[in-house]
Amino acid sequence: MTIKAQPTLHTARLELVPLGHEHREFTMKLDMDPEVMKMVAFGRPFTEDEAIQVHTWLMNCATSVPGFGTWVGFAEGEFVGWWVLAPVPTTENPKSFRTDRTEYGFRVSPKFWGQGYAKEGAREMVRYAFEELGLAEVIGETMTINMASRAVMAGCGLTHVETFFNKYDTPPPGIEEGEVRYSITREEWLRMQKPSMTRSRWFPAFASWLPRLLLSRLWSYIFQGRRLAAGAASP
C-alpha cells in the first residue's frame, strides 16, 4: 500500500486539517486551559514552554510513521480541537516505531463539549487508520476516572483491555485509581461496519417499494369493503 502525505479529512461537521506551525496558538490555548487539563498529564494547565513542547511533539508525529500525524478540526471555520494518530515505540528500541499500530488522542475546546465532536473526530481517525493506512490496531489511554474520554473510546468501538499504574513526580488528582488502555483491531472494526453497510444497501430499495405495497393493500381492502357493502345492501 502506498501511503500519501497526511491528507485533509472530513466528517459531517468537521474539516480536519493537518497540523501546521500556524496552528500553534490553538494547541497552546487548550494545553494552558485548567478545565481541559484537569485529567491530563499533571492535572494542571501547562506552562507556555510546556505547551510549545507539546505542539512540537504533535508536529513531529507526522514524520514518525508515514500517514500518522495530528489534525486540527474546524466547524464552519471555528477551531474545535485536535486529534492525533501517534507512533507507538517498539519494545526492542524506544526510538523506533511500530508501523502497524497507533495510539490516538484528542483535545476539544470546552465550548464544544457535549456536542459529539470528540467522538466524531475520533471515529474518523479510526476509520482513516484502518481503511486508508491498513493498520492492525488502534489503542487509546486515559485516566480511569476520565469517564468522558472513556465514553469516546467506547463510542468508537474500542474496548477496555488493561488497567495499569504509573508513578509520577507530580501525580494528578485521581491517578491513584490508575489508567486504562482501550483497543480495537482492524478485524473488529471491519465486523462493525458490515451491518451498517448491509442496511445501507437494502434500505433504499426497501424504502421505495414499501409505500407501494401498503397503498396496494389499502386499495385492496377498500375495494373488498365496497363489494361486501354492496352485497349486504342487495335484496
Swiss-Prot record:
EC number(s) recorded for this UniProt protein: 2.3.1.-
SUPFAM superfamilies with a match to the protein in the record: Acyl-CoA N-acyltransferases (Nat) (SSF55729)
Please describe what happens when the gene is knocked out. Eliminates TAFC production and increases FsC production about 10-fold. Does not affect the production of FC.
Q: Which residues form the N-acetyltransferase domain?
A: 14-190
Its induction note reads:
Expression is induced during iron starvation.
Q: Which first-to-last residue range defines the signal peptide?
A: none
Q: Which residues bind CoA?
A: 106-108, 114, 146, 151-153
Q: Out of the domains of life, which is the source? A: Eukaryota
What PROSITE patterns does the database record attribute to this sequence? GNAT
Transmembrane intervals: none
GO function terms (MF aspect): acyltransferase activity, transferring groups other than amino-acyl groups; lyase activity
Entry-linked Pfam families: Acetyltransf_3 (PF13302)
Keywords in alphabetical order, please: Lyase, Transferase
Which EC main class describes this enzyme?
transferase
Function of this protein?
FsC-acetyl coenzyme A-N(2)-transacetylase; part of the siderophore biosynthetic pathway. Aspergillus fumigatus produces 4 types of siderophores, low-molecular-mass iron chelators, including excreted fusarinine C (FsC) and triacetylfusarinine C (TAFC) for iron uptake and intacellular ferricrocin (FC) for hyphal and hydroxyferricrocin (HFC) for conidial iron distribution and storage. TAFC consists of 3 N(2)-acetyl-N(5)-anhydromevalonyl-N(5)-hydroxyornithine residues cyclically linked by ester bonds; FC is a cyclic hexapeptide with the structure Gly-Ser-Gly-(N(5)-acetyl-N(5)-hydroxyornithine)x3.
Q: Which protein, by its recorded name, is this?
A: FsC-acetyl coenzyme A-N(2)-transacetylase
Q: Which organism is it from?
A: Aspergillus fumigatus (strain ATCC MYA-4609 / CBS 101355 / FGSC A1100 / Af293) (Neosartorya fumigata)
